[in-house]
Regions:
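Terminal amphipathic alpha-helical/low-complexity segments used for targeting or macromolecular assembly
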Residues: 1-184
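Conserved small/polar residues in nucleotide/adenosyl-binding loops
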Residues: 196-203
């Protein structure tokens, strides 16, 4: 979704949303892509800054059931929703997430990020022995060979320090206040999704 074509809601669109059971702390903080079709947004509460993409496509489910993209039965707080995404039956809320295009999110309890998070990057994990001393900082790009170097080349302290600094720098660049759900992600029948970055085409289902 490009922010270049987002706009504020028109008064008649707000009226349509309210007829659909939607509420907002402040409608001025809600932006939408054009054309906006309010009929695809029902029983949603908005708070904070929320941006909505287009709702123009349908999803075909196993058995031939079709569901139109849109948002139904959810609370959104400080979120950006991409084009042609379906969010349906969020029992609590989604807070501080950027959600990509063509995502399918259904029957989720809660999704949130609170405060700054590195999303698991640069978290040290003990390896080889349970008493510590050979911790490896994990991060998104960690390979088996790099973990081997960090764990077993402690006799090369300069090398270890450089690798640790590289990982710390990567983690700092990943740190932020918003979680990220990539394009074409499916999250179905899931309890809590917190402090998460999901890449495109991933699936979380229980």
């Amino acid at each position: 979704m490009s922010e270049g074509y987002l706009r504020h809601l028109l008064s008649e669109e707000i009226a349509d949303l309210e007829m659909n059971g939607c509420t907002a702390d402040n409608w001025e903080n809600i932006k939408v892509a054009s054309p906006f079709h309010a009929e695809h947004v029902c029983n949603v509460h908005f708070s904070g800054s929320v941006a909505l993409g287009l709702f123009e496509k349908e999803f075909t489910l196993p058995g031939g059931v079709k569901k139109h993209s849109g948002i139904r039965n959810a609370t959104l707080h400080n979120c950006k929703i991409g084009d042609n995404t379906l969010i349906e039956n969020v029992h609590n809320y989604i807070s501080n997430y950027f959600i990509g295009d063509d995502c399918f999110i259904q029957n989720v309890n809660v999704m949130y990020v609170e405060g700054r998070s590195s999303f698991g990057n640069n978290v040290e994990v003990s390896v080889l022995n349970e008493t510590g001393g050979r911790e490896v900082p994990i991060y998104n790009g960690l390979s088996a060979s790099l973990a081997y170097l960090i764990a077993l080349y402690r006799h090369r302290p300069a090398l270890i320090l450089r690798l640790q600094a590289m990982i710390a720098d990567f983690a700092e660049r990943q740190t932020g206040n918003y979680g990220f759900i990539g394009n074409h992600v499916k999250i179905i029948n899931t309890g809590t999704v917190s402090y998460t970055h999901l890449r495109a085409h991933e699936t979380s289902a229980h």
